């Protein structure tokens, strides 16, 4: 059911934990302005002492953006709300501008949140935005309807950014027209961004087409998204259960899958395999559904060695093993603290006294490691360790206990690659299962009631 008259009722914010404050992303448009005022009303009504910080991102892409940011600052000053304006600086891409602007926006919002010790970012995405997103994804790939709703689920009510800050969208059930009615009752205006009607971009084209449809079309699209979200969550839960049953990590960088995977439900098994392939290979996106399904069929036929998503798939008597392929590993480069290496490892430097070079361990160094023979072939362990990061100047003094590259001057913690940047709440279950498997950092608790990572 769509919310058509937003107010201070509990339906909008009562399920969100604001204990540690919130950063509200406010552009000055109607949706984000209404969100800000609704949040302010909620904080005042509940007597919350937590900080509400409005942040406006000036992308610097058109005239008038600075004036709009100033208008937001003025409104915040009038309403007693803390406000900051952050600017997207540097060169802008000639293609893919909307995506680049989105990435820059979330990066700046996260920086602002971290500076205040706030782990929650709230955005004003509406039911209209959700319908547009679903239609855009459907138009891009007609096969999405057969993929248990992964894309057709649209935007998640919450998304974990960089495995640290939660981005929450409390207005996904609220129409833009209702928000504007609310602002009129408050006697508050808003800015109109001309790019929102510039049909040179995909979203404005979809928005224009949707405006010509009946209200029933909007309702049906959102109903589709809701059903797809349920199916995506169910598939993720099945995949998570499967990962916990059949996956293990005999050595750093090496995942073993029990052949029981091949007799499990095909849909859950293929989804679990895709997530693990992307994680082992350090890929930001899951491998292609069709190619993954074809690989699954080949695995059912017997032993093989193949590559997909930068991952070597080695099926032999000892089990089904996944590891990063040697091709395309990062070249030696200066180590930078708090960065992601090869899409797979979060690098933390414990010694900042001088420049350090980080590089893959390499096959030659891996061959010198003393590895006890066990259930897992030593050759597989060495191949996996060869793709792990180490310091160039430390090759002769690795001192690696149990064959694992651990140096006191730096730490390399695994990350769940396909979910490391954006983790939709739909996918919490498989993300947590993989994090437990590979030893990634635990997931921070979701601020939404009823959204568990279990």
Curated annotation (Swiss-Prot):
GO terms for molecular function: ATP binding; tRNA(Ile)-lysidine synthase activity. Its EC number is 6.3.4.19. It is an enzyme of class 6 (ligase). It is found in: Cytoplasm. Its main location: cytoplasm. ATP binds at residues 27-32. GO terms for cellular component: cytoplasm. GO terms for biological process: tRNA modification. InterPro entries: Rossmann-like_a/b/a_fold, TilS/TtcA_N, tRNA_Ile_lys_synt, tRNA_Ile_lys_synt_N. The N-terminal region contains the highly conserved SGGXDS motif, predicted to be a P-loop motif involved in ATP binding. Ligates lysine onto the cytidine present at position 34 of the AUA codon-specific tRNA(Ile) that contains the anticodon CAU, in an ATP-dependent manner. Cytidine is converted to lysidine, thus changing the amino acid specificity of the tRNA from methionine to isoleucine. Belongs to the tRNA(Ile)-lysidine synthase family. This is tRNA(Ile)-lysidine synthase. It comes from Mesorhizobium japonicum (strain LMG 29417 / CECT 9101 / MAFF 303099) (Mesorhizobium loti (strain MAFF 303099)).
